[in-house]
Amino acid sequence: MNSITKSYGSKFALNDVSLEIGPGKIVGLLGSNGSGKSTLMKMVTGLLQPTRGTLTVTGLPVGLKSKALVSFMPDRPLTESWMKVRDAITFFQEFYDDFDIVKAREMLQFMKLNESDRVSVLSKGMSERLQLTLALSRDARLYLLDEPIGGVDPVARGKILDAIVEYYNEDSSIIISTHLVRDIERIFDEVVFIREGEIVMHEEVENIRIKYGKSVDDMFKEVYAE
């Protein structure tokens, strides 16, 4: 991502953002609501086009070819209310050539989800577990998870974080957007702080602890209190 700007008239959703993520990293994209996190993710998936700047995934310009490399879990469910869990799995298997049905069923068991359950009766936490299962069961190079623990209880959060660590492909990278930093910082290798459409910090988690003597959550509070 090189010098990306996304504007709507005179309002900038992203302003001259440059970012490079290496393979094998779990990266936290941290910011308050409206900071530009979701816009950035949608641009990497190709759902939004930049006003200016260039975007690539493993060297490929973002477009039709790069979409096969990116698995996106948006902040709204990808499933329909009429579906059962098995219908959602079947839909993804038929739609994505890289969908691993064996991995999906293993994750369902880990998540304590039944294939016969109706999507419409799943709790918020169970629904998020299903969405994560669908996203991580693809053999992608980049996984984008938009607020995967937002609005779920602490038990569900723990299960979701454990699943991310257990099932993500270590040759790939994951970008996780969130504002719930304390609950999730334990799984991050790097963090990116975004505020008002601009990146204000990109740092390895260990460096934050050594250089600043702070947790990621403490640094987040400091940056956003300014």
Q: Which sequence ranges carry the predicted segments?
A:
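Conserved ABC transporter NBD signature motif
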Residues: 52-66
